[in-house]
Amino acid sequence: TIDMELQKKVEESIEKNLRAFKSSEPLLDRAFVVMTNPNNGQILSMAGKKIVEKEGKIEVEDLALGNMTTSYELGSAVKGATLLTGYETGAIHPGDQFYDAPMKFKGTQAKKSWNVSGFGNINDLRALQVSSNVYMFQTALKIAGVNYVPNGSLDIKQGAFDTMRYYFKQFGLGVPTGIDLPNEIIGQTRKVDSQPGFLLDFSIGQYDTYTPLQLAQYISTIANGGYRMQPQIVQEIREQSIKEEVGKVIRSIEPVVLNRIDMKKEHIDRIKEGFRWVFQEGDGTGVKYFKNAPYKPAGKTGTAQTVYGGDDPIGRNAKGERMECYNLTLVGYAPYDNPEVAFSVVVPWLHDDKNGINSIIGKEVLDVYFDLKQQRIHGEATSTGSSKQN
């Protein structure tokens, strides 16, 4: 199903941006993109690149399989799953408001949104638009049946983790995606849930780890209205042919629905409207890059505070401790009213959480997808690979 022209352009975007940002980002060594047709699960592009320094020279190697064999904290990109879990458990309802200001708990540092003074009174759509952490923390507390008391202690039972993971897994977060390739991992489900504050971290994508492919399956599931599709690389199997012509089809691989998420359509549509706000409205965190795109994208930016997970000694301090850094992620689909392509971008281990490399790559690969589509309509580009864009 891989669209070879698209794949080549996506790889070029990743390599170009890795090289451009490397001088200011010493820990940066990899980036990943998955693009799918959300309606049938076909993978249109699965690309990953890794910087390797050899004899003082920077070389870029292929790491496409890293999309399914490496996992990371993916940050705010997963907030759609948090809100949907809140709706479905009855913990929150569409339109509910919370006051976004730093939250203080006994014996811990304040938990807050990236805008440290807070966003004031906000609803769920606004929470997605500006990526409020506090709204997600409040949602997680409601799921756990706990009311926030300033400077109070937190009493969160293991069952709250189980509930949130149960719903996250319906999107493919924390379970096998079902891709028709070997050696897929499911990420890390952390076991040290005894500290209740970790549920708050989980709600903003800073606890369990997921693969870039799982992230693509999650956003595809929202894009298509709630169906988790098996990701497919193979579209058909043909007979071996002695001559140059293509052998006849022995078996066509049909799309496979792995599950329908246990969530109401109006709730999924509510999240999709929030994702539209992120890219299209006001001070949405993706507006700078996506507002004027003619193909009308929607999506969600992501930032996760983490520690360096690579092997380079440069990623450790004098005591040998792993250095703190950020993972930048992005999910989206287009057009927002009738999605035909969905994507995930994952760029781990950055010092600057505002350099925009995730959005730059995301915009470039969406531009390429729709440029190729137009060229094919006008007969200017060949459709290589078996996946035609329609």
Model-derived features: positions:
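Structural motif corresponding to the C-terminal cap of alpha-helices
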Residues: 13-22, 51, 147, 373
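Hydrophobic residues within well-ordered, non-membrane alpha-helices that form the packing/core
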Residues: 14, 18, 140, 275, ...
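Charged, solvent-exposed alpha-helical segments that act as regulatory interaction surfaces
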Residues: 23, 228, 284, 371, ...
